[in-house]
């Protein structure tokens, strides 16, 4: 049982260790991370902080629904946990958004590990596979697109649930 706890803790913290230059703010994520994805989170957070639930974004054309906008992740439960955490610390910063984004790789790691274990793959092999996969360019490149990374992170959990139910 202690080994399982250690494995899950390792799976959760490993992306933060591997991405230490980002985790400790030596590097920043480029592309659309700040100008596009962070802006949605900041807009929603600031309105929530002022006591208003933002259902509509008036800044895009003649306006656009935030609830049905997949880029805003308005109804995504981890986003609301993130907003609550940011409310506790008092601000939603680009750094806290980056930590939220990296946490998606942790979600992916746990899901992939659970999925591989359903096939009775040895723990060491499954752990090694997950750690190598989580540092691959295809996974870490998605840091530029937080919504895509969070959507990708839950794919293995879905596969695990489907496999367990059959």
Language-model features: where?
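Transmembrane-helix signature of polytopic, membrane-embedded enzymes
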Residues: 112-135
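Membrane-interface helix-boundary motifs at transmembrane edges
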Residues: 2, 117-121, 166
